[in-house]
Each structure stands twice: as C-alpha cells, then as structure tokens.
A protein has these predicted regions:
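C-terminal/domain-edge helix-coil "capping" segments
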Residues: 20-33, 125, 129-203, 211
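Surface-exposed short loop/turn segments
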Residues: 84-134, 352
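Short acidic low-complexity segments
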Residues: 69-82
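Alpha-helix N-cap/helix-start positions at coil->helix boundaries
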Residues: 196-199, 214, 229-230, 245, ...
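Conserved hydrophobic register position within alpha-solenoid helical repeats
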Residues: 201-204, 235, 266, 302, ...
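A structural "domain/chain start" motif
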Residues: 20-64, 174-177, 189, 203-206, ...
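Alpha-solenoid repeat junctions
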Residues: 208-212, 239, 243, 270-278, ...
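Amphipathic alpha-helical scaffolding segments comprising HEAT/armadillo-like alpha-solenoid repeats
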Residues: 175-192, 213-225, 244-256, 276-291, ...
Length: 358
C-alpha cells in the first residue's frame, strides 16, 4: 500500500497544473476576496510608435466581454471597485515579466520575452498588490509596417491597434480570469446559457478540469453523452482531471461503446483516475479494449493508461503488441504507429519498475 500511495502521489504531482500551484500560493484571505469580486475597474494603456493611442476601443471591448460573466465594470478609479484589471496594448511590446520559463511562463498565452511585435498584456491588482496572473495576446505579425502595406491598410500604427482589438474580441480572457478568481458559478451560468457557442463550452469545460471543480461533474457527465464530439471529448478529459472515483463506470462505458472519436479521450481519463485512486478495476476493461480495437488512436491512449497504473497482467499483452511494432522507426511514414510504440515501450518500463519496487 505504501508503494501504491507513493506512485499515486507522484502522479498527482505530475498532473498538477501550473495554475493550481500558483493558486496554492495565495493566502486564504486573498482567495476569499477573489471569490467575492464583482466590481472591476478596467484600466487600459495603448501605445503605438506615434505615442499614446486611444484606449477607448479597448476599454469598450473589455467592458463588454467582462459583462458577459456578470461583472460590474467601472472605468473611474474614484468609483468603488474590488479589483483592477489592467490591459497594456503596444505596437512594439516592452517585456514586463520576471522569468523566461517555468510556472505560467511556459503556457502558450503567457507573456513572451522573445515577442517584440504588437501585443496586449493582461494582469490584475488586488488591493494594491500586483498578482502573478499574466496573459498576453499577440497579432500574427511582428512588423506592423510590412503587415499594413501587405494588407493595403494605411497607417501601420492604426492597423496594429485594430488587430489587437480583434484579438481581445476573440480571446476568452473573461473565462480565464473568472477561473483565476475561483468563481465557478459565473462559469456555470455562461456554460448553461443556450446562446453560448460550442467552442466556448469546450473552453469552459477545460477550465472546470483546471479548477478540479467537483460541482461541474453533473454537467460533464451530460457532456460525455453529447452529440457534439468536441464537448464529449473535453468532458471526458475534465472528468479525469477532477478525479471523482464514481465517474469511472461512465468513462469505461464511453471508452467501450462511445463515439469512435470519444473513446481515446475516455481511455486517457481512465488512466488518470485509475492511478489517482489505485483502482485496478480499470485494467481489465483497458486490456479488453486493447485486444479488440483496431483504432490506433485508442490503442495509444489505452497503452499510456496501462502504464499509469502498472499491473503485471498487462505486461504480456503489451509485450505482444511491442513485438508487432518492432519494424516501426522514429521516421516511420505513419506517425500514429510511432506514438503507439512509444506508449507501449513506456508502459512496459513502468510495469518493470513497479515489479522492481515490490
């Protein structure tokens, strides 16, 4: 049992997201204040190569989008507010971060030291304390002059500012900041709104998993049965991240009989859940699926899952599969087979290591 507990603890450490670790650094008092935020002061700085630019278009976008989640937005610092949401948009971005890598710096929408083109940096201040949450949106070009000429768009500074405004209209920062503040009820309200797009629902489901939000489980179980395959897949992965053991039977059913595109995601979630709880009941369904499916994508996720909860009974089937993949090389024409071989080799090593520890 001690070895199993150690293995599960190692898995939890591997699964813990950067956002989770940062949230754990907040004090209990700070978390309580974040959860009660309603009045948001929006402050925007816009800088082009010509000097200060008009912040009004950015303020309009941010105000409109924050209201989607029910926040009361103010723009006058003299008015009562719970938090200050800062947006700095520049034609040539000036770096304001402190680290090149690690923590949130490794996330795709975090501020980049290397990017010198048009960008908007997003952050917030709680009671005069600048919080570590940082996000950044960038244009798809670095040189606004060249981009404006290619688009025949006139002034490059105006073009850069207009494109940054478009990025803020597309980027779902209101959902991200709401998750950061731990206000799941606002997330649920938007998710439950019939007018919410499928793409946004998928992003929200990902945030439910990020928050390890157990209150989201009923919605995710419904999502698992959705005809919208992207919602179903995202729901499966979020259930794995949240880690409620009583969702294992539903995920097994989804892996065995769900839509073909859903089954790999369900297998992946089972690997996480099984290892988290030391639940070896998932091994037989995984092995049965490995034996009966011809779907390489599903085989890949099943193989990875079997390695996350090493069981001796999985070794023989995995070794047999490994032998059938001896001919596969790293530069093989079929990248799926390369991934399958990698997953099988890794899982066999985990089983061997587990046996050694015992």
């Amino acid at each position: 049992m001690k070895r199993l507990a150690l293995w599960s603890m190692m898995l939890v450490l591997l699964l813990a997201s950067n956002g989770w670790g940062r949230q754990e650094s907040l004090t209990a008092e700070e978390k309580q204040k974040l959860e009660k935020i309603d009045r948001v002061l929006v402050e925007v700085i816009a800088l082009s190569d010509k000097g200060p630019a008009d912040p009004a278009p950015f303020i309009e976008v941010v105000t409109k989008r924050m209201k989607e989640f029910g926040y009361t937005v103010v723009t006058d610092p003299a008015q009562p507010h719970d938090v200050t949401f800062n947006i700095k948009c520049e034609q040539h971005k000036i770096w304001e971060g402190t680290t090149k890598m690690g923590s949130d710096a490794d996330l795709p929408d975090s501020p980049s030291r290397l990017w010198k083109g048009p960008a908007c940096q997003l952050s917030y201040v709680l009671e005069s304390k600048k919080m570590p949450w940082r996000k950044e949106v960038r244009t798809d070009f670095v040189d606004a002059q060249q981009a404006a000429e290619a688009a025949k768009a006139g002034d490059p500074s105006d073009y850069a500012m207009s494109k940054l405004k478009e990025r803020l209209e597309d980027y779902d920062f209101p959902a991200l900041i709401t998750a950061e503040w731990g206000q799941e009820e606002r997330l649920f309200k938007v998710y439950d709104d019939p007018a919410t797009s499928s793409a946004r629902k998928v992003r929200l489901i990902g945030l439910f998993g990020y928050l390890f939000e157990t209150k989201a489980v009923p919605r995710l179980l419904e999502g698992l049965k959705s005809n919208d395959i992207e919602i179903a897949k995202a729901s499966a992965l979020a259930l794995g991240n949240i880690g409620q053991k009583d969702t294992v039977p539903m995920l097994i059913e989804a892996m065995k009989n769900g839509q073909p595109e859903l089954r790999p995601s369900a297998a992946k979630a089972l690997g996480v859940l099984g290892a988290l709880h030391g639940d070896f009941t998932i091994v037989d369904p995984l092995l049965e699926t490995l034996k009966t499916t011809d779907d390489v994508n599903l085989k890949i996720e099943v193989a990875w899952a079997l390695g996350k909860l090493p069981d001796r009974k999985a070794q023989e089937p995995l070794v047999a599969l490994q032998r059938s993949l001896y001919h596969v090389r790293e530069n093989d024409a079929d990248p799926k087979l390369v991934k399958l071989k990698e997953a099988v080799n890794w899982s066999i090593k985990q089983i061997d290591t587990w046996e050694y520890l015992q």
